[in-house]
Amino acid sequence: MARIGDGGDLLKCSFCGKSQKQVKKLIAGPGVYICDECIDLCNEIIEEELADADDVKLDELPKPAEIRDFLEGYVIGQDTAKRTLAVAVYNHYKRIQAGEKARDSRAEPVELAKSNILMLGPTGCGKTYLAQTLAKMLNVPFAIADATALTEAGYVGEDVENILLKLIQAADYDVKRAETGIIYIDEVDKIARKSENPSITRDVSGEGVQQALLKILEGTQASVPPQGGRKHPHQEFIQIDTTNVLFIVAGAFAGLEKIVSDRVGKRGLGFGAEVHSKAEIDTQDHFAEVMPEDLIKFGLIPEFIGRLPVVASVTNLDKESLVKILSEPKNALVKQYTRLFEMDGVELEFAEDALEAIADQAIHRGTGARGLRAIMEEVLLPVMYDIPSRDDVAKVVVTKETVDDNVLPTIVPRKPSRSERRDKTA
């Protein structure tokens, strides 16, 4: 507590001049004092200056073409999805800036609605990686959540607010920064309604979760338990506004292609009927033709679909794309393993037909790009085990036979140095 100074005078704040009786708290420094009111004022000034510094100016915001080019350096193929995401993300952050300008001006603003994104496509085709790469480019907090772990409030499982806690943690508990972040919700197809018709029994992990997600998708002031878990009345909450949080929800939606083909495939009789063979229907890019009624039939409720106006579809990766994924991106698997071997002083080389064989195995397993690393680990495991203990290896060459026939990679021995040759002849 502040004390009465010598001579009976009350101590005063060195900044505003108020005495210790006029304020709640007076903090002493070397020959100076500051009151709690001045501390609050200084804190507000600093926060405003930091907010102005953190705001991304429109001319600094990457244009859609720049976003797509950045994604091109990391993700092979999926050009339509890249363009869709680039435009949606650019418009989202333009919308945030428009809202900030509207608050500063007195003119009646045109309110811009939020455009969350729904991504459809098979597993291992780059849905999660696209979202992660986007967040890396924009330097915004990014959180990944699994929809299968969620249940509606009051049941065993995670509340939807725990998704927001992951975003706050990704922003180092800076709530203001978290409020302009990106949340990626995976496996959203697993929370589809169990049947097309509403049931009289509760569907707590399906339709119930969709209902619980509606408010945070649209934008609401949510109360988040700081330690996660269930809410209880005696704990403090973190308040976060989700109005400017971009949600990207994604899923494989296995079976949706049949619903689309039933709608798109024209059936009829007579000379004017258009007939498609089963093979033609199977090879059509059905995800590109998805309509809201298809998603409703799949099990998503209309209110949930209405909050996801942007739909981006990814397609199965062919052999050529998988080979490119192995070698071309900035953090390609071949480059990663080459670096690992370099750290042991060994050169690693892949024959072109070896990369094709790895791609063939990934297609055969149905794991897409996600399965490439597992195959590489299987192929390289024996040499990665032996090489650190050896000093006579210069190069390891992986061939088609290594992949297909489970043969050990070719090991090229290191030529002995002059000193080693002299030691042998001595």
UniProtKB/Swiss-Prot annotation:
This is ATP-dependent Clp protease ATP-binding subunit ClpX. The gene is clpX. ATP binds at P122, T123, G124, C125, G126, K127, T128, Y129. One of its GO terms (biological process) is cell division. Residues 1-54 form the ClpX-type ZB domain. InterPro entries: AAA+_ATPase (IPR003593), ATP-dep_Clp_protease_ClpX (IPR050052), ATPase_AAA_core (IPR003959), Clp_ATPase_C (IPR019489), Clp_protease_ATP-bd_su_ClpX (IPR004487), ClpX_bact (IPR046425), P-loop_NTPase (IPR027417), Znf_CppX_C4 (IPR010603). PANTHER family: ATP-DEPENDENT CLP PROTEASE ATP-BINDING SUBUNIT CLPX-LIKE, MITOCHONDRIAL, ATP-DEPENDENT CLP PROTEASE ATP-BINDING SUBUNIT CLPX-LIKE, MITOCHONDRIAL-RELATED. One of its GO terms (molecular function) is zinc ion binding. Keywords: ATP-binding, Chaperone, Metal-binding, Nucleotide-binding, Zinc. Belongs to the ClpX chaperone family. Zn(2+) binds at C13, C16, C35, C38. ATP-dependent specificity component of the Clp protease. It directs the protease to specific substrates. Can perform chaperone functions in the absence of ClpP.
